[in-house]
Every structure is written in C-alpha cells, then in structure tokens.
Amino acid sequence: MSGSLYRSPSAALYKSPSMSAFSGLPAAFGSMSVADLGSLTRLEDKIRLLQEDLESERELRNRIERERADLSVQLIALTDRLEDAEGTTDSQIESNRKREAELQKLRKLLEESQLENEDAMNVLRKKHQDACLDYTEQIEQLQKKNSKIDRERQRLQHEVIELTAAIDQLQKDKHLAEKAAERFEAQTIELSNKVEDLNRHVNDLAQQRQRLQAENNDLLKEIHDQKVQLDNLQHVKYQLAQQLEEARRRLEDAERERSQLQAQLHQVQLELDSVRTALDEESAARAEAEHKLALANTEITQWKSKFDAEVALHHEEVEDLRKKMLQKQAEYEEQIEIMLQKISQLEKAKSRLQSEVEVLIVDLEKAQNTIAILERAKEQLEKTVNELKVRIDELTVELEAAQREARAALAELQKMKNLYEKAVEQKEALARENKKLQDDLHEAKEALADANRKLHELDLENARLAGEIRELQTALKESEAARRDAENRAQRALAELQQLRIEMERRLQEKEEEMEALRKNMQFEIDRLTAALADAEARMKAEIARLKKKYQAEIAELEMTVDNLNRANIEAQKTIKKQSEQLKVLQASLEDTQRQLQQTLDQYALAQRKVSALSAELEECKVALDNAIRARKQAEIDLEEANGRITDLVSINNNLTAIKNKLETELSTAQADLDEATKELHAADERANRALADAARAVEQLHEEQEHSMKIDALRKSLEEQVKQLQVQIQEAEAAALLGGKRVIAKLETRIRDLETALDEETRRHKETQGALRKKDRRIKEVQMQVDEEHKMFVMAQDTADRLLEKLNIQKRQLGEAESLTMANLQRVRRYQRELEDAEGRADQAESSLHLIRAKHRSSVTAGKNASASKIYVLEDDQ
C-alpha cells in the first residue's frame, strides 16, 4: 500500500520527449552562427525560466509526497494501535470509529490533493511539452536560416574579396595617375608661385622700406622737437628755482625784520610797563596829596596868612611837575605812534611778502607739476623712441633678410630661366635629331628595300658575307672591350665619388670646429655682458642704499628740527637737484645699457643671417650628397639594364614624338604660368613676416629643382639608352643591308659621341651641384645653431634689461616719495605761517588794548587837570 502511495504518475515527467529535445540543444547551438546568438540567448532565457518553474513544481510535489508519507506513517501507526486496542471497551470502539472517520476524511483529502496535484502536473507537462516543441521548431528554423546565411555569407565574402582586389588595383592605378598629375601640377604651380611670391615680396619690402624710412625721419624730427622743448622746460625750471631761492631769501629777511620788530615791541612794552608803574605811583602820590590837602584845608584858614608864600611856591612846583609829565606823555605818544607806523609798515611788508610767498609756492607747485608731466612725457617719448628703434632694427633686419632672399630668388629665377632656355635648346636639338632619325629611318627602309631586291645577289656573295661576318665579330669584340672600358670608367667615377664624399666630410668637420669656436666666442661675449650687467646692478644697489640712508637721515632731521624748517627746505631742494642729477646719471647708464643691448641685437641679427646662410649651404650639401648616392645607384642600375635592352626604331620614333608633345605642353603651361606670374607680380602684403618660411620653401624648391634635374638626367639616360638601342638596330640593319647602312652607322656613331660628350658635361655639372648643395647644407646647420645660441643670448639680455627697468622704476618711486616729503615740508611751512598770522593777530589785540590804556590815561590826566583847576579857584575865592 505504501509502495502504491509513493509512486506518482508525475515521475514520468523526467523521461518526457522534451528532455531529449533539451539534450539536443547543445549540438544545435554548436552549429549556430553569430547572427542568431541574440535569438538563441532569448530562447535560453525562456528555457531557464521554464526549468526554474519545473524545479519549483518538483519541490512542491516532493513536499506533498513527504506530507503524504507522514500521513501514511501516522495511518499505519493508528491502524496498529487500532489492532492493539480491539479488545478494549466500547468507548474505545467509538473513539476508533471517530478516528476511522477522521482517517477517511484525511484519505479523501489526500486523494483530492493528489488528484489536484496530478491535474496541475499534467497541465504543466502539456504546457512544457508545447513550449519545447515550439522552441525546437524555432531552433530548426533558425538552423536552416543560419545555414542559408552561411552560404550567402561565403558567397558575399568571395564577391567582397574580388571587389576589394579590383578596388585595390583601381586605387593603385588611380594613385599612380594622381601622383603623376600632382607631380606635374606641383612643379608648374610651385614655380609660378615662387616667381610671383618673390616679385611681390621684393616690391612690398621696397615699399615698406620707403615707408619706414619716412616714419623714421618723422620720428627723428619729433624727437628733436621734444628735446628742444625739454631744454626749454629745463631752462624754465632753472629760472623758477632761482626765483624760489630769491623769494626764500626775501622771506628770511622779512623774518629777521619781524624778529627785530618783535624785540623792539617787547622793549616798548617793557617801557610801557615802567610808565604804567610810574603812573600808578604818581596816582598814589596824588591820592595821598589829596588826602593831605583835605586835612590841610581845615588848617588852611589857620595857616593861610602864614603859608601864602609857601602855597604859591608849591603851586609853581606842581605846575612844573605837570608840565614835565605832559611833555613825557607827549614823547611817549610820539614814540608809540612811530612804533605803530613801523608796525603798519612791517605788516604791509609782511602781507606783501606773504602774498609773494604764496604766489611763489603756487608757481613752485605748478612748476613741479609741469616738471612731473614733462618727465612722464619724456619717459613716454623715451619708451616710444626705444620701441621705434627696436622696430626699426627689426624691420632693417627683416628688410636685409628679404633683400637677400629676393636676390637669391632672382638668382634662382635666372637659373630657372637658363635651365628653361637649355631645355628649349635641348628640345630643338631633340627635334632636329628626331628629324635626322626619321631621315635615317627612311633611308634605312629604302636600303632594306634595296636589300630585298638584291637578296639573290646576296646569296651569291655568301662567302664574302662570311668574311664580313667575321669582321663584324671582331668589331663586336672591340665593342665588348669598349664596354669593359666604360665599366672601368664607371668604377673610377665611383671611386672619385667616394673620395669626394670623404673630402666633404672633412670640410664638414672643419665647419663644425669653426662653429664650436664661434660658439665659444659668443659665450665669452655673453659672460662679459653678464659681468657688466652685474657690476651695473651692484652700483645701482649701492647707490639706492646710499640714497635710502640719506633720505632716512633727512626725514629724521625734518622731524626733529621744526625751527630750522627753511634751512631743511633748502637742503631738500639741494637733495632734489642731486637726485635729478643722479637720475640723469642713471638715465645715461640706462642708455649705455640700451646701446649695448642694441649692439647685442645687431650681433644677433648678423649671426642669424650667418646661420640662415650656413643652414642653406648645409641643406644644399645634404641634398647634393643624397643626389650623388642616388645617381651612383641609378648609374649602376642603368649600367646593368643597358646590357640587355633592345627596342625597335619605330617605337623610338614614337617615344621621341611623345616626348616632344609632352615638352611642348609643358612649355605652354610654363609660359602660361610665367604670364600669370608677371600679371600677379604686385599682389602680396604679408611676406615680410615669413622670411624663414620663404627660406624653407626656397630649400624645398631647391629640392624640387634637384628632382627636376634628376628627371632630366633620367630623360637623358633614357635618350642614351634609346641611342644604344638605335646602335643595336643599326647593327641589325647593317647585317640586313651591308652597303646602305654604313652611312647611317657613321651618322649614329657621331651622334653617340656627341651624346657621350654631353653626358660627361652633364655629370660634371651634376657633381658640382652636389658639392655646392653639401656646402649649403652644412652652412645651414651651422647658422641654425648660431641662431639658437643668439636667441638664448637675446632672451638673457632682455631679462637683464627688464630688471634694470624695474630698478629704475623703484628709484623713480623713491624720488616721488622724496617729492611727497618736500610737499609735507611745504605744508609745515604754511602751518607755521598760519601760526605767525595768529601771533600777529594777538599782537594787534595787544596794540588795541594799548590804545585803550592810553585813552584811559588821557581821560584820567584831563580829569586831574580839571580837579586841580577847581581847587585853585576855590582857594582864590577864599582869599
């Protein structure tokens, strides 16, 4: 029973046909192509999801089977217990029945769950089988598509390979054709551009030189005018300084007079105090006298008769004393009025001097402002003059370089014209030779016809021909000996070329030694200039330290000595003069430094020109050496090829006509380019700043000309080969027509000798050109090194000049600080003038108080006179 419960029909799922389909998947995947990997990955993902669902269903089935097994175990245990408890009571029977009923329910539930699980497993199995069938069908379709795609891909690959081969061949042909076309176009365009650029550059440089000369003359005139104005301003400054000194002397005289007046005023005040004390004493004595008089009035009546004479005498003494006092008072008043007049005169003189001092201070400030403005203008003018000098030097250097380039370009143009004329002459010579060869060909054809007509006669003369053949064999041996001689000459030429190379290397070593010596000299000059600059810098530092100490001492004196302000101001003016002189000295030293810098720049320009010339020579030497090596290799190749080349006379004629047409087309294009170059000769404005680029282009053009000469050499060699071919054909024609071809052979031999002489001349010129190119290449390298060293020296000199300018600016700033100190001193002078005015105001107040005292004194004197008169009148009445 348990065995039947444990066995489930779902176990057959593991042996379903879908698993066989899964087992066939790797083989199917192995035959897949790369194009179907995306669809296969999607199918694999779906299969993986289905497998995960299947695993979850398996786990659920196993769990249900475990629960069923547990329930079956419980059922077995319950049945055992039931069998053990059959002999128990009815209650146990009822309980057993209940348990059996529960077991029946559990069995039903278990069977229902099994049925549901089996249904679900069947549904899942069907779904899985359907999905697997769909996937297998899709995989088969994909395999079919993949096979079709593979076949199509192989076919397309074959087609692509064929097409790429065809395209490569077409591209090679096209590239070769484009190279040939571009080469010819580049030659014509570069020659025309070179001619027009050089002509435009020459015209522009001439115009620019004229314009710069005019600007230089204008600037020199302006500099002269500015110098005249500066001299006038310095003269005005000197006059203002003299006026200021005179005003200061007047101010000092006024100060001395004022101090004397103050002393006199003090003395007058002392005298006034003494007069006041005397007046007080007299008033006290008067009060006592009045008191005594009041006391004596009581006794007058008693002593009237007795003292009449005495009273009269006393009255006369009082009158005398009053008269004396009035006289003294009048004298004092006259002295006070004289002093007041002097004080008013001094005040007027003081106000006049003060106004003059203020005017002079204003004039001094204006003069200082104008001096500062003129100094700034002078600095700006000096800067502009220096900039213009630098610009003029640069332009002169550029002008010289452009002139040199123009001369070189004109020489190159002349060479090109000569080459062109030579090419025209060669063309004409080739045309004449072509005509001669055509005539020779016609004659050879006629001779061949004659030979055909006389063929039967030649058969009779076979024996004679055999002898002539032997003679021709001997001639062939002689030609072989001549060929060996030519090979020996070629070997000797190679040996001479090797010797020339050794000589060029030796000269290059000598030039390098000269360059090293020049570099050492330049280094010594740089060291000397740096030492001079260091000395100048040390002197300037010492001068600045001395001026700093001096300024500090002057500041301390100005702070400590307020009373001696005028003397300090005079000393400050003297120091300003000294500083201006020192500034002039510094400016002179700066001008010397600038002159040295200018000399260095001139040396730099000269060295740069040398570098450019040497670099050009070095480049030419290099190109000549390369051309010599290539010519040697080409000569070897041509020597090897010349031994086995045979062509027809008709092909030679066709080649010559083609060359003639080609030369005519090139001549027409060159003539058109030359016309365009003459038309566009005046249309370039920006060639002055591209001197080095023009030099590089000139070198490239030189390379191109060398390539052109190489092409001409190749053409010449081809013509020589054609001549050799003509010789071979002439020999054949001689074999065919012995009698008619001797004249043609003689003509061709003369032509061969002419061509050999031309070849020797051309090789000699080629060797000379190579030697010149090597020299120019070596010279270019040496000059390039000199240019680099001179550029470094220029940078160092520029740095030192910048440092000197910074130091000069620092000294100017210190001079401005000294001027600010003088302005502070002037402000102190004005403050003291204000204090002096306040003191004068106080003196005016004292004078006004003195007037009040005088008025009171007069009023008191008049009152005393009136009182004495009334008393006398009373005494007379009493009498």
Curated annotation (Swiss-Prot):
Q: Where is the signal peptide?
A: none
* Location of region: Nonhelical region: 1-36, 861-879
Q: List the disulfide bonds.
A: none
Q: Respond yes or no to whether keyword Cytoplasm is given for this record.
A: yes
InterPro entries to which the protein is assigned, alphabetical: Myosin_tail, XRCC4-like_C
What keywords are assigned to this protein?
Coiled coil, Cytoplasm, Motor protein, Muscle protein, Myosin, Thick filament
Q: Which domain of life is it from?
A: Eukaryota
Q: Which GO terms describe its cellular component?
A: myofibril; myosin complex; myosin filament
Polar residues bias located where? 860-869
Compartment(s): Cytoplasm, Myofibril
- Keyword Ribonucleoprotein on this protein? no
Q: Which residues form a coiled coil?
A: 37-860
Where are the annotated segments for Disordered? 837-879
What Pfam family does this protein match (any one)? Answer: Myosin_tail_1
Sum up the protein's function in the record's words. Paramyosin is a major structural component of many thick filaments isolated from invertebrate muscles.
Give the protein family: Belongs to the paramyosin family.
Oligomer and partners: Homodimer.
What name has this protein been given in UniProt?
A: Paramyosin
Organism whose genome encodes this protein: Onchocerca volvulus
